[in-house]
Structures are given as C-alpha cells and as structure tokens.
Swiss-Prot record:
Similarity field: Belongs to the tRNA pseudouridine synthase TruA family.
GO molecular function, one term: RNA binding
Protein name: tRNA pseudouridine synthase A
Subunit structure: Homodimer.
Keywords: Isomerase, tRNA processing
Source superkingdom: Bacteria
Catalytic activity from the UniProt record: uridine(38/39/40) in tRNA = pseudouridine(38/39/40) in tRNA
Catalytic residues as annotated in Swiss-Prot or TrEMBL: 52
EC number: 5.4.99.12
Enzyme class name: isomerase
Origin species: Thermus thermophilus (strain ATCC 27634 / DSM 579 / HB8)
Binding positions (substrate): 110
Any single GO BP term: tRNA pseudouridine synthesis
SUPFAM superfamilies: Pseudouridine synthase (SSF55120)
C-alpha cells in the first residue's frame, strides 16, 4: 500500500462543494472517490480543506491510498481518463505513509478575483466577481494590513462552533490588466481558515473599496467578533483555493 498526494484542479461551478454529501449531490470528493478504484486505489480521498459550492481550485491536495503497482507518474493521466471535464489531477507524488493532507498542512492560500469594468463579462461570469464602479485600492490595502496577524476572525465567518482565533500570514492586493479589463486579486495565506472567513473578509473589503465604510472599521470586527458589523459574504464564484504547503519530511516516502 502506498500513500499518494494528488493535486486537483477544478471548476466549482457545477459542484455542490468539495465535501461528499448525501442526497445524490455532485461533489469534488464524490467524483474523485468514484474514479479511484479504476487505478487500484481505495475509494477514499482526504482533502487539505473544503470549498463551498461554486468555489474553484488550482491545486487542492488530497491524499489517497493505492494498492496497485501503477507508476506514480502515470496516475494523473490514468485518473483524468475517468474524471469529468471540470475536475482533473494536475500532479501526483508518493508521500510518507502517515502523511495527512489536512492535518499536516503548514498553510493554505486563497485568491479572490474581482473584475472592474462598466459592463459584465459573459466569459468570466463564473470566474470572477464583476464590480461596475472603480475601487479605492489604497483604502483596501490599508484595510488588508489590519487583518494580518493573529485575531479572532469569527466576525467574518459563517456560523462556527470552533474557536475563532486564526493567524493570517499574508494578505495582499494585486492589480492585473487582462483581456476582459482591470482585475483586482486579493490573496490570503494562513495555516487555517474558518468557514466562510475569506469570502466574509472580501465582502467587507469591497465595501471599503466602494467607499461604504472606512478601513479602520475592520478593527471593531476583529475586536468584537460580531458578524453583524462586517460586510456581506462575497459570492463563491470569485474564490479560488490556490495551494497548500507541507513539511518536507512528510513529502518523502
């Protein structure tokens, strides 16, 4: 038995989320686990985290256990023949037998895409959030700086039973001029995130960018952990899971 780390890219538009669910809902985990026996693997895949319906991923890590002797370099091609068009394996490697995709992650990173132009884009309607009005990027960057470090982020999250304290290692804004127009990209990196935290932060930052609230208003949200003080949850389709990092010793068989 070998344990493999798979990196999966997916378009979340037609998925009911990452995590396997009942009632016949289509999920990323469900589709991957359905394909695994086709390469001689056990039908169980453990992800680095979970994404909601409509959220995309560039390289979501999963660990799986393989009983067959299939060479690891052939795993992506073999699995991709069995997977749907909106879910593909883009990398595979053998890892330590006790490697755990969720528990061993040192950090995880997300990106949120915002298209800023006068008219919506049919091509990016499932890939980026459209905003008609120009954004005050300087104010957004000031607000982003307040989020860095260790705080109670419950004020940005969905209903949570877990403690809200998390450490945000990196929070930055990038601007790109793409074919569709000006794109603002928000990047967040931390060891772990609360459910809905990233989209809650984005929704609040958008209010800052649109002049609906001052940057310093985020201080009260972090201090009180009151969700009512934050902005709305940003739509799922602009969010991407980018990557996760692991200790080198866990990545060696």
């Amino acid at each position: 038995m070998r344990r493999l780390l798979l990196l999966c890219e997916y378009d979340g538009t037609l998925f009911a989320g990452l995590q396997r669910q009942g009632r016949g809902l289509r999920t990323v985990q469900g589709e991957l686990e359905r394909a695994l026996p086709g390469i001689g693997a056990l039908p169980k895949a453990v992800a680095a985290g979970r994404t909601d319906a409509g959220v995309h991923a560039l390289a979501m890590p999963f660990h799986v256990d393989v009983e067959s002797a299939i060479p690891v370099e052939k795993v992506p091609e073999a699995l991709n023949r069995l997977l749907p068009e909106d879910l593909k394996v883009v990398g595979a490697r053998e890892v330590a037998p006790d490697f755990h995709a969720r528990k061993d992650a040192l950090w995880r990173a997300y990106r949120y895409r915002i298209l800023v132009r006068p008219h919506p884009s049919p091509l990016l309607r499932h890939r980026a959030l459209w905003v008609r009005r120009p954004l005050d990027l300087e104010a957004m960057e000031e607000a982003l700086s307040l989020l860095l470090g260790r705080h109670n982020f419950l004020g940005f999250a969905k209903e949570e039973t877990r403690p809200g304290e998390r450490e945000l290692l990196e929070a930055r804004l990038q601007v790109a001029e793409g074919e569709a127009g000006l794109e603002v990209r928000l990047y967040f990196r931390g060891k772990s995130f609360l459910r809905g935290q990233v989209r809650g932060m984005v929704g609040t930052l958008l209010e800052v960018g649109l002049g609906k609230r001052p940057p310093e208003s985020l201080k009260a949200i972090l201090k009180t952990a009151d969700r009512r003080l934050a902005g709305p949850t940003a739509p799922a389709h602009g969010l991407y899971f980018v990557e996760a990092a692991y200790p080198e010793e866990k990545l060696s068989p």
